[in-house]
Amino acid sequence: MIYKVLYQKDKIVNPRRETTQTLYMEADNIVQARALVEQNTPYNIELIQELTGNSLKYEQEHADFKLTAFGQTNSED
């Protein structure tokens, strides 16, 4: 699934709508999406939204749409 994550660059500065940024990512579920962002960035997550159907198509048609991939390690012992 593809998720849209709205965030602030860090957790220290008070959130302001004008400085909210967006990233798009793939994850199995919303819990995994949040965990990946929290483990790999200092971002203050405001909202995570699953994109499907027309919402996904709309976002993909914009120039800013680019999937962010975090280094994932699959350790199966």
UniProtKB/Swiss-Prot annotation:
The keyword Nucleotide-binding does not apply. Pfam families: RpoY. InterPro entries: RpoY. The keyword Transmembrane does not apply. Keywords: DNA-directed RNA polymerase, Nucleotidyltransferase, Transcription, Transferase. One of its GO terms (biological process) is DNA-templated transcription. One of its GO terms (molecular function) is DNA-directed RNA polymerase activity. Its EC number is 2.7.7.6. It is an enzyme of class 2 (transferase). RNAP is composed of a core of 2 alpha, a beta and a beta' subunit. The core is associated with a delta subunit, and at least one of epsilon or omega. When a sigma factor is associated with the core the holoenzyme is formed, which can initiate transcription. This is DNA-directed RNA polymerase subunit epsilon. It comes from Lactobacillus delbrueckii subsp. bulgaricus (strain ATCC 11842 / DSM 20081 / BCRC 10696 / JCM 1002 / NBRC 13953 / NCIMB 11778 / NCTC 12712 / WDCM 00102 / Lb 14). The gene is rpoY.
